[in-house]
UniProtKB/Swiss-Prot annotation:
Condenses choline with CDP-diglyceride to produce phosphatidylcholine and CMP. It is an enzyme of class 2 (transferase). This is Phosphatidylcholine synthase. Belongs to the CDP-alcohol phosphatidyltransferase class-I family. The lineage of its organism: Bacteria, Pseudomonadati, Spirochaetota, Spirochaetia, Spirochaetales. Its EC number is 2.7.8.24. It catalyses: a CDP-1,2-diacyl-sn-glycerol + choline = a 1,2-diacyl-sn-glycero-3-phosphocholine + CMP + H(+). One of its GO terms (cellular component) is plasma membrane. Pfam families: CDP-OH_P_transf. It comes from Borreliella burgdorferi (strain ATCC 35210 / DSM 4680 / CIP 102532 / B31) (Borrelia burgdorferi).
Length: 234
């Protein structure tokens, strides 16, 4: 039984590391201009990152293989997929005005390095401290909704700045405050997100989906600012 558990534990690490393979093919798809493949690979990367931690805790991987730091492996994979690949995407694409590209890309790299190296990136009351480096979501939004350059410039600049500010960003699945509101609209937004990715929607439907997702992100931002003030004495 112990040998089986050990094999399963190693498989979890391999599963986490498979995100690096996804990252490699994501870079190749960017270079080849195959954004349809990039979109699917980005979603696969999000799925891997979303479940590998739960699997590791369930199988007690840390106890079985103490010589491998699963958290570090996960962070290496995440930095590549959540930060470095989006930087390549935005630098090589036409999603940001040319004169701002390098500044934005440097801002993304440095702000993410700051976030990933923080030991207090997540608070004790289940918030992200500062913008949580979800730059791959910008990749998805730009592929599906063809965001305007000025919209990208403004929103990405705000996210870079808030990476260094101790604002508490809602962790949708864990933050207790406003949970009864956050969970339902998160589920609805995710469903719309998935449908937008894997279905051929009309122009009108895409505009509606875009509006819903923008409102969702606006809610998360405004609610985070409000809750930062409300929980400031914790």
């Amino acid at each position: 039984m112990k040998n089986i558990n050990l094999i399963l534990a190693w498989l979890v690490h391999i599963f986490t590391a498979s995100g690096l393979i996804v990252g490699l093919y994501s870079i190749i798809s960017i270079v080849n201009g195959n954004y349809s493949l990039l979109l699917k690979l980005t979603v696969i990367g999000l799925i891997i990152d979303g479940i590998d931690g739960t699997m590791a805790r369930k199988l007690k991987v840390k106890e079985l293989i103490p010589e491998i730091d699963g958290t570090l492996l996960d962070n290496i994979t995440d930095y590549i997929n959540y930060t470095f690949i989006p930087v390549i995407f935005f630098y090589l694409g036409e999603f940001i005005e040319e004169k701002y590209k390098v500044a934005i890309c440097i801002g993304i790299l440095l702000s993410s390095a700051y976030q990933f190296s923080r030991t207090d990136a997540k608070t004790n009351d289940n918030y992200f401290r500062g913008f949580p480096s979800l730059w791959n979501l910008f990749v998805i939004l730009n592929i599906i909704f063809k965001m305007e350059q000025i919209t990208n410039l403004i929103t990405m600049s705000i996210c870079i700045i808030t990476s260094f500010i101790p604002i508490k960003f809602i962790y949708p699945s864990k933050t207790k405050e406003l949970r009864k509101i956050t969970i339902p609209i998160t589920i609805i937004s995710c469903l719309i997100f998935v449908v937008s990715i894997f279905s051929e929607l009309s122009t009108t439907a895409l505009k509606m989906a875009k509006t819903v997702l923008i409102l969702y992100f606006a809610y998360l931002t405004l609610a985070s600012i409000y809750l930062t003030y409300k929980t400031r004495n914790r």
